[in-house]
Design a protein with these regions (language model features):
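Charge-patterned, long linear interaction tracts outside catalytic cores
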Residues: 225-236
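Short secondary-structure boundary segments
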Residues: 1-9, 126-131
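Glycine-rich anion/phosphate-binding loops
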Residues: 1-6, 37-45, 87-90
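Glycine-rich, aromatic-flanked loop segments that form ligand/cofactor-binding clefts
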Residues: 3-22, 42, 49-66
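C-terminal basic regulatory modules in eukaryotic proteins
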Residues: 220-224
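Active-site oxyanion-binding pockets that recognize sulfate/phosphate
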Residues: 32-39, 83
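Second-shell residues forming the walls of enzyme active-site clefts
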Residues: 47-199, 207-214, 219, 230
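Surface-exposed, active-site-proximal loop segments in enzymatic domains
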Residues: 25-35, 74-77
Length: 236
């Protein structure tokens, strides 16, 4: 609740949260962004976190489907390859997504290749996005691509090929971050594709208006602030 309310009060509609990956100790880029190592604990903690986000009026985004925690490579700078079987992934990494699907407004897939399942990375894979996420898990919310500038997306080709692969696999919106030239290239390509508006994206709009003044007047914010101060030993 606290994160969501303060982000909304800053004028931002939503955060790409929470991380549903497992903290296996293998992935440094996931690391302590994950709630825990065990799927059940991740599911319980993430469910509470998302309920708080919803209470504050913010939509949720679970990432990185179907799980980034079991690869050492960083998808920002490399193309990670997960060598496990589908059965192993289902038993571990996929569990938080399956258990939390009712609280998820959006999902962000991983730029990871699960080579024994599909040769394409998850964000460009119809199998992962359509067969598993939409079909088996029954997810009907928004699918965001992860940042298409990342090295993990390079397996699909150049920026135009990455966009085509993401949209073709089932992404509702693509992300192109921290690279203005590639963002302009993406916009031009999308105009050529004549991509129309997607009604699913309306789910991501804020559901409650917060301002800094309203937040400071909120009893719930006051209680949360006091709790944080007690936990950290710091008064703001």
């Amino acid at each position: 609740w606290l994160m969501a309310a303060e982000v909304l009060a800053s004028g931002i509609d939503f955060s790409f949260a929470p991380v549903l990956d497992l903290h296996t100790g293998l992935s440094q880029v996931i690391g302590n962004r994950a709630f825990a190592a065990e799927p059940e604990r991740v599911s319980i903690l993430a469910s509470a976190f998302m309920s708080g986000m919803h209470d504050a009026g913010m939509a949720t985004t679970g990432k990185h489907f179907p799980g980034h925690g079991n690869v050492a490579a960083d998808s920002h700078t490399d193309i990670p390859v997960d060598t496990r079987t589908l059965a192993q992934i289902r038993e571990q990494d996929l569990q938080p997504f399956a258990r939390c699907v009712g609280l998820l407004d959006a999902v962000m897939p991983a730029h990871v290749i699960y080579e024994r399942v599909d040769p394409a990375c998850a964000g460009f894979s119809k199998y992962w996005l359509q067969t598993v996420l939409r079909g088996e898990l029954g997810f009907d919310g928004v699918i965001f691509s992860d940042d298409l500038v990342m090295a993990g997306a390079a397996a699909a080709g150049g920026m135009e090929q990455r966009i085509d692969a993401a949209l073709g696999a089932g992404c509702d919106m693509i992300l192109v971050c921290n690279a203005r030239d590639q963002a302009l290239q993406a916009l031009a390509h999308l105009e050529n594709l004549q991509v129309s508006g997607n009604p699913r994206l309306q789910r991501m709009q804020r559901r409650q208006r917060w301002t800094p003044e309203l937040l400071e007047q909120s009893e719930q914010w006051g209680r949360a602030k006091k709790l944080v101060e007690e936990l950290t030993g710091e008064a703001s």
